[in-house]
Amino acid sequence: MACSHLAAAAAAASPAAARSPAASSAATASAFARLSATPRVASGGLAVRGQRGVAAVVAAAAGAAAATPVADIEERRATEKQPIIVIDNYDSFTYNLCQYMGELGLNFEVYRNDELTIEDVKRKNPRGILISPGPGEPQDSGISLQTVLELGPTIPIFGVCMGLQCIGEAFGGKIIRAPSGVMHGKSSPVRYDEELGKALFNGLPNPFTAARYHSLVIEQETFPHDALEATAWTEDGLIMAARHKKYRHIQGVQFHPESIITPEGKRIILNFVRFIEELEKQRAGEKN
């Protein structure tokens, strides 16, 4: 499995699950019943698909916005037109990532990996794409691999756990069983290259603490150095983050920034958002 955990582990390891009203099974069941006939739920600038999306709406609405100034959040809510598309690889942690994005004032839409085609994603004209964690291997991830290959050259992509493995495999790497075995809620120090990793890890201590829920990694021996560069590692040298050499807006992490075991996780999401914003400014300047 790419990400080894259960829904109960997600609740224990995530600040989103810990404080969300959706943690009440009765309240969640009631919300699901009211919206059972509605395929799409939209609220407060974010849109999600299916019953699992109800919890995301509740959690995002309830979350605090302490990671970024209120003015920045309000500006995003007022000015963003294009969504960030979240490809959900059927993982219980996906909506904890969505909560962070909601707290940062982002407009996003969530779709399971078999709900859309690449053409559907193109028509949505997203400003960025987040590829979520998930069970299995990259080949089991619906459109995730194809998204990296076809849309990565033009659209910023952030892969988490399975998402990083999709990036690795898309560009020629081999995904293997982790030498240290299954990581299930393990806390590990992660060290990053302060030059190559500054886009995602700016402002973080080096090393920082990260939550790991995975049994697969990108193999070091077949790492595609011609296309990608590793940006962060565990103490025993396992690759914990990477980016594309040419398309530096393709980035991913093996650990879980959305877990409470990763204290700086929201900052990592914020850094990716700011990277998108800077890229948009750069592209706008090139057009003028």
From Swiss-Prot:
Highest taxon listed in the record's lineage: Eukaryota
Expression tissues: Expressed in roots and leaves.
Chief site of localization: plastid
Transit peptide, residues from-to: 1-58
GO MF assignments: anthranilate synthase activity
GO biological process: L-tryptophan biosynthetic process
Pfam families: GATase (PF00117)
Pathway field: Amino-acid biosynthesis; L-tryptophan biosynthesis; L-tryptophan from chorismate: step 1/5
Listed EC numbers: 4.1.3.27
Quaternary structure note: Heterotetramer consisting of two non-identical subunits: a beta subunit and a large alpha subunit.
Protein name, UniProt field: Anthranilate synthase beta subunit 1, chloroplastic
The species this protein was found in: Oryza sativa subsp. japonica (Rice)
